[in-house]
Amino acid sequence: MAFSFDLAVIFQRERRMKRKSRVTIRRRRRRDMCKSHEPMPYIPFDLVIEILTRLPAKSLMRFKSVSKLWSSLICSRTFTNRLLRVPSFIQRLYVTLTFLDNSLQRKSKLLSSSSSPGSDISTMSSFVVDRDLTTPSMKGYYLSHVLRGLMCFVKEPSVKIYNTTTRQLVVLPDIEESNIIAEDHKNKKIMYRIGHDPVGDQYKVVCIVARPNDEFGELRRYLSEHWVFILGGDKSSGWRKIPCPSPHLPITQILSINGRMHYLAWVQKFDPMLVTFDFSSEEISILQAPEDIRWFKSNPIEYYGKVALLNLSDLKRECTMNLWVMEDVEKNMWSEKTLVVHPSQMDIVKSTSLRVAGTTRNNEVILVPHNIRYTLTGEVIVEPQNTTLLYIFLYDLQKNLMRKVEIKEPPYHTKFWDVVGLDDVENFMYL
């Protein structure tokens, strides 16, 4: 018994000595590392950038607080441009909802739905609403469009720009020098558009102000002004007026592609012209639109990197769409083709009014149920949708195939809903 007790004491003492020895070794190693003058392994700057570009946006926003160096790096134009070159596999669909709350007050919500990373939108059957982007500062404003992660909110004549990644919101100054904005004209039109200048690597906001010319005997049918504001620049510079060769009145939505924006407009007669604004040179050019095109329900779209015009005038009646593609800008050459909806989908287009809301990166046209009608006096009336189920159609112009994509799990049930469009860029630009 005594022998067993002595043996246990010896074993316990040995365990203590071994434990103490391991602790001593760890402390000695730590002390030697502190005394060592060998430099830490060098990580190339390009590799640091490459690692950071693979991180999600939330992580990068947290890393801005690590140090001033990290903050300046993440907010730098070089890093932002590097992120834009990294292909994103998440396409977000932006949806607006209007409904009455429990106190019968009208409320508006801005939601975005995201696909799963790595999913292919060409085979998707649904989007899932998972983000509420509504903020009190947006109250009274409507979302005009989204470009490269930048949202444009308008409440004429005011405009706000919101970065969906950094959650930064800026209010642009009023255009006090505009003669048309200051006028109280019932047919006055104000349009804003965000664009990117690839030469100067700047984001700019263009404001188009126009109205009919009511003075009898004047040769000019319309009065218009173009103003430009540089985002992230010197705030004291403000808005700059851009000369326009011919006053005109925009009649369609605006397409931004390859550093330019395009839209149809009336210049003198009611024949539509294609107006192009170059974000780099800040020059405006006006080209003749295809002779046989009808401006009503015509929208500029991107068609495999080219400017195209898609007309839906005959979609509901004849189940056809007309597509014009600009093949040569210098010669103003257009190609035309008529698309006939597949027989199995004719009932859909005959029973539903649709409008164009842009294109996907796979060149599918986004078609949204249309619930807006115009009175004879030009008044816009928004009617409720036929259902509280949210959905869009994606139309492949080359394959001539249309498919329905549902928008699932909206947090509010309402027939007043609309889709702004798709965007798949995370932008860390400081506004």
UniProtKB/Swiss-Prot annotation:
SMART domains to which the protein is assigned, alphabetical: FBOX
Origin superkingdom: Eukaryota
Any one Pfam family match given in the protein's UniProt record, by short name: FBA_3
Chain positions of Kelch repeats: 143-189, 227-275
SUPFAM superfamilies per the UniProt record, alphabetical: F-box domain (SSF81383)
Gene3D superfamilies from the UniProt entry: 1.20.1280.50
Keyword list, A-Z: Kelch repeat, Repeat
CDD domains: F-box_AtFBW1-like (cd22157)
Regions crossing the membrane: none
All copies of domain F-box, residue ranges: 37-83
Record-given protein name: F-box/kelch-repeat protein At4g19930
Organism phylogeny: Eukaryota, Viridiplantae, Streptophyta, Embryophyta, Tracheophyta
